[in-house]
């Protein structure tokens, strides 16, 4: 049964080629919003908190600061409304899920750049 589900996912789900990113990276996600009959592109720029799942059900969480309020948004990787993902900065973190980042404020909330 699992083989059948994997086959269907591989054959019929259209995957877009997004860059490889992980926790700690600062990315910008461009996605389409429909308002009535109009469609427009909006972007969400923030730090990747986590990637979870695999295959068709994979999602990633982004956190940004809007004023003094933290805003998190969860995006499915296979969302048809996703247009593109840009990596602004690669971050050096030691965890795959950086939930501790939610409590940090000020200079402590800064993520070091990954050395190349």
UniProtKB/Swiss-Prot annotation:
Which protein family is it in?
A: Belongs to the bacterial ribosomal protein bL19 family.
Determine if Ribosomal protein is one of this entry's keywords: yes
- Biological process GO annotation list? translation
UniProt cross-references to InterPro entries, sorted A to Z: Ribosomal_bL19, Ribosomal_bL19_sf, Translation_prot_SH3-like_sf
Q: Does the keyword Transmembrane apply?
A: no
Cellular-component GO terms for this entry: cytosolic large ribosomal subunit
The residues forming the signal peptide are none
This protein's gene is called rplS
Write the record's keywords in alphabetical order, separated by commas.
Ribonucleoprotein, Ribosomal protein
Q: Which SUPFAM superfamilies match?
A: Translation proteins SH3-like domain
Q: What is the role of this chain?
A: This protein is located at the 30S-50S ribosomal subunit interface and may play a role in the structure and function of the aminoacyl-tRNA binding site.
Q: What is this protein called?
A: Large ribosomal subunit protein bL19
